[in-house]
């Protein structure tokens, strides 16, 4: 039990600690399981429509196998040789919903050939590029690589961090998820549905 508390304390300290801008993060983040926290600069809070909560992460998540693949590749599209995949990233969908008007983003079906599950909306390629550029300009990352002797599941540890930090963009398990984010994501899902219906006419 004492070791478990130590892991919880260590994770919280790491997620409050050193952060790397998205573009620099690949040189510092290990390819291992662990937790990550996404932070923003002061201007980004205003872009997203929230009052600034300095030193509070916007989002906390986990990777069961590879922080680089889950965090940097999927959410932040740091590998420019691969297209961004908002349809596969709840983090990108949340940022897209809140930045829809500012970045002129349009939601589309994740799989245009077989549209459905519109809550998992994607963006047009041009919109994905604008979202990625904004994320690279404003966001930074802190990580906690999981140790080999971890005696608590990452899922439980993630839950403990969500309760401790209460990040705005986590819609489950955080004590106070943002109603405005939920509403904004519903707008995007409806737009993706309408886009698919128009394409099928």
Task: Indicate where each model-derived feature is located.
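GIY-YIG nuclease catalytic motif and its immediate N-terminal context
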Residues: 1-130, 139-201
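PLD/PLD-like phosphodiesterase catalytic module centered on the HKD motif
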Residues: 135
């Amino acid at each position: 039990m004492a070791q478990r508390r130590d892991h919880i304390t260590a994770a919280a300290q790491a997620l409050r600690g050193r952060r790397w801008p998205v573009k620099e993060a690949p040189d510092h983040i290990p390819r291992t399981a662990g937790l990550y926290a996404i932070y923003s600069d002061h201007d980004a809070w205003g872009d997203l429509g929230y009052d600034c909560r300095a030193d509070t992460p916007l989002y906390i998540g986990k990777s069961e196998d590879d922080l680089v693949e889950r965090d940097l590749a999927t959410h932040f599209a740091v590998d420019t040789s691969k297209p961004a995949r908002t349809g596969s990233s709840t983090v990108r969908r949340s940022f897209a919903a809140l930045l829809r008007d500012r970045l002129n983003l349009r939601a589309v079906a994740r799989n245009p050939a077989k549209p459905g599950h519109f809550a998992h909306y994607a963006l047009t390629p041009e919109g994905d590029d604008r979202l990625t550029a904004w994320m690279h300009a404003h966001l930074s990352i802190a990580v906690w690589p999981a140790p080999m002797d971890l005696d608590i599941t990452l899922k439980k540890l993630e839950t403990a961090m969500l309760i401790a930090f209460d990040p705005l963009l986590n819609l489950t398990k955080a004590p106070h998820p943002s109603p405005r984010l939920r509403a904004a994501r519903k707008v995007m899902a409806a737009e993706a549905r309408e886009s698919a219906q128009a394409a099928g006419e």
